[in-house]
Amino acid sequence: MAARDVLTKNQLCVLEKLETASGPLSAYTLLDQLRERGFRAPLQVYRALDTLVKSGFVHRLESINSFVACAEPHDHSHSMTAFAICDSCGQVTEMSDHDVDHRLDEWVRSTGFAAKKAVIEFRGVCAKCRAEAA
């Protein structure tokens, strides 16, 4: 886990933008929002995102090709994170549980499968949007 104080200027700009965003952002949306801070090319954003994802500060949401800041900024030790993504408002809720991690790790090992990556994303409608629709 990298400490926040070792992040580069670009990495810190991207992280701060994600931390203050009201929902997930794509790399190109980040680029548009960071142009005023000197960002000119998609590669600047992608490099920063790559490091932030690897160090646990940011999560990539595979199903919507977007990024969110980690909801647990002081605990990047979780290996398995699940997300609930609202298709109506875009709200993302993050959940990690060491017991779930352990059970999934045991299951994968018992099958002899060599997992490289795991992504758990639930798509649907959040409680607030469901209540508003009722």
Region spans (language model):
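Short, basic interhelical loop/turn and adjoining N-cap
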Residues: E36-R40
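Non-DNA-binding regulatory cores of transcription-related proteins
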Residues: R60-I64, V68-A134
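Short acidic, hydrophobic short linear motifs in intrinsically disordered regions
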Residues: P24-L34
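Short alpha-helical segments that sit at the start of domains
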Residues: M1-E16, A21, N65
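Short, hydrophobic-biased segments on the C-terminal half of alpha helices
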Residues: Y46-D50
